[in-house]
Amino acid sequence: MMALYSFSTDLRIRCAADYKSVFDDALFKVHQPHFLFLAKLTEQPNSRLGIVVAKKKVRRAHERNRIKRLARESFRLHQPKFGSDIDVVVMPKVGIETITNAELYQQLDFAWQKLQRLAKKHSKVVPTSQN
């Protein structure tokens, strides 16, 4: 049971080419007041997460770390619910350091739900269009 909810290296986008692939070929975009989610379907066996927190957007290191920690934790809990395997890159927007953890979780939760709906909707459309 613990392995199901772990956040191993298999669930992380690690190399620059994989990040570039998501940025260039993003099939889904989910906007939140303080986040932008880019996602694309992948052939990898698992959904994977990449987090990009630029110093330009969030100045203080402890705030960048807090955002990354909350995004990873939220992904870890929602990842088993995805209908298909997707690569997701999460990018915070300016002003994110002023909101509380509860508000961050709420925005992340809403974004994951929307992403799950988009992925399920897309996976239903693709097989019928190939026949």
UniProtKB/Swiss-Prot annotation:
Domain of life: Bacteria
One Gene Ontology molecular-function label: 3'-tRNA processing endoribonuclease activity
Reactions catalysed, as given in the entry: Endonucleolytic cleavage of RNA, removing 5'-extranucleotides from tRNA precursor
PROSITE patterns: RIBONUCLEASE_P
EC id: 3.1.26.5
Enzyme superclass (EC): hydrolase
Biological processes annotated in GO: tRNA 5'-leader removal
GO cellular component: ribonuclease P complex
Annotated keywords: Endonuclease, Hydrolase, Nuclease, RNA-binding, tRNA processing
Stored SUPFAM superfamilies: Ribosomal protein S5 domain 2-like
Pfam families cross-referenced by the UniProt entry: Ribonuclease_P (PF00825)
Functional note: RNaseP catalyzes the removal of the 5'-leader sequence from pre-tRNA to produce the mature 5'-terminus. It can also cleave other RNA substrates such as 4.5S RNA. The protein component plays an auxiliary but essential role in vivo by binding to the 5'-leader sequence and broadening the substrate specificity of the ribozyme.
Subunit architecture: Consists of a catalytic RNA component (M1 or rnpB) and a protein subunit.
Similarity section: Belongs to the RnpA family.
Protein name, per record: Ribonuclease P protein component
High-level lineage: Bacteria, Pseudomonadati, Pseudomonadota, Gammaproteobacteria, Moraxellales
